[in-house]
């Protein structure tokens, strides 16, 4: 093997091959440094894409600045209209809840829950439980009514008993006596005052 005719350029596609009639072609370092993403593009196409990328990035920066200015203007308008942050939050929550309600997932879940509820209410176990609770409620109401009637009847019997009447008579007698003593005491007040004005008799001599 002739070492003079061997291609020693590591970047050459003819590396390791003998060539008597061809000379080494210089390799473009820019092409060698290209990433696989831009392979197959000409230099003009790459420059055009890079220019377009720069333009889009500048437009994004401009749009962000415009958006920030619009947000400040929107906040100023809300402040002048008296729209508080709490009201805006409530409005956003209401809108979000409405969006949830009209969403397909919520509708499907509601339909599924409705089907389960219908199955449960139509099941024999649910009906038996409902009947048992209804009977228990009726029995409780009847028992309370019976107890109330018994208490009322017992109180009536106590009022009609001789002991209760004797107690009422005693209370009435005591009340009449107290009232009479008060009236008699008020009548004796002037006489007591008059006796106070009467001169005392002389003591008997020894």
Curated annotation (Swiss-Prot):
| Biased composition, class Polar residues, residue ranges | 1-14
Q: Which gene encodes it?
A: TPD52L2
Species name for this entry? Homo sapiens
Q: Indicate what this protein is called per its UniProt record.
A: Tumor protein D54
Subunit and partners? Forms a homodimer or heterodimer with other members of the family. Interacts with MAL2.
In what ranges is there compositional bias, type Basic and acidic residues?
Answer: 175-185
Residue ranges that the Swiss-Prot or TrEMBL entry lists as coiled coil = 38-82
Carrying Phosphoserine, the residues are: 3, 12, 19, 21, 96, 149, 161, 166, 192, 195
The modified positions for N-acetylmethionine read 1
Superkingdom of the source species: Eukaryota
Name the Gene Ontology biological process terms: carbohydrate metabolic process; regulation of cell population proliferation
